[in-house]
Amino acid sequence: TLGPIYLSKMNVENESSEFTQHKIPRNDGTNYADYLLSNVEVRCIAVDAGNRKWMGTTNNGVYVISNDCNTEVKHFTTENSPLPSNLIKDIIIMPNGLVYFATDQGLCSYMSDVTATNEEMTKDNVYAYPNPVKPDYTGSINIVGLSFHADIKIVSVNGTLVNQGKSTGGSYSWDGCDLKGRKVASGIYMVETATEEGEKGTVCKIAIIR
């Protein structure tokens, strides 16, 4: 059966030749599961700072799989991306989140939303972009320079919580909406950070113009 397989750390240390195919639960009330990327020939794998797996295939483009290997985050092909070919020979991920794909028809790059992590979060390395956020901007607001699994809280100047979550790698993406999914009003918003262990990090500001 085609598809990715893995060798556990314990089996490596014991010089075992036992490989495992990862199963994804169907979550349909049954105990059934399906193999990850079953019958897909994987040629190369790269892992980003968020522990997501970028899998290049022989004729199916690139799959991005979540850190727990249970969710397909993205699937790039020649039909929905600038990939010149669906035959992927190699994938390289840079610390700034830029991903290079080597295909049999040439190179292609993609700016992902995950950057390398920082051990310490300081005012010198934690920042948001674009900043200010102008009225015609419709994309995500990215906070970078974070530690692994950092806790993020975005609050208004009067202390109202508008968004919270955890970083993926050294980055966090915010859609500019509050907890109810509404676009926030013009103003200054504070990004409060803390480490996975609960230690306070730094604060950066985002200016939004509607």
Regions from the PLM with identified roles:
Residues 120-153, 171-174:
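Glycine-centered coil/turn sites that cap beta-strands in beta-rich domains
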